[in-house]
Amino acid sequence: MKKLFIVMIKFYRKYISPLKRPCCRFYPTCSQYALEAIQKYGAFKGGFMSIGRILRCNPFCKGGYDPVK
């Protein structure tokens, strides 16, 4: 499961992300955050952390530096 999520994120970063303008409000980007979270905490917890991060990445959030803890 962990490897599947990582492959999906890498596919997104290589083929889908270049087609749209940069819009992430955080550093590291949401996709990089997701990779790090899944590698560090596994598919279940890392996946939930990634979903939370993506939900926070919107025009109403200030953004900024937000590393995986």
Swiss-Prot record:
Q: List the GO terms this entry assigns under cellular component, sorted alphabetically.
A: plasma membrane
Which SMART domains does this UniProt record tie to the protein? Haemolytic
Q: What is this protein called?
A: Putative membrane protein insertion efficiency factor
This protein's UniProt keywords? Cell membrane, Membrane
For this chain, the family text in UniProt reads:
Belongs to the UPF0161 family.
Q: Which PANTHER family match?
A: MEMBRANE PROTEIN INSERTION EFFICIENCY FACTOR-RELATED (PTHR33383:SF1)
Q: Does the keyword Membrane apply?
A: yes
> What membrane topology is annotated for this entry?
Peripheral membrane protein
Organism listed in the record: Clostridium perfringens (strain 13 / Type A)
Highest classification ranks of the organism = Bacteria, Bacillati, Bacillota, Clostridia, Eubacteriales
* Subcellular localization: Cell membrane
Question: What is known about what this protein does?
Answer: Could be involved in insertion of integral membrane proteins into the membrane.
Q: What positions belong to coiled-coil segments?
A: none
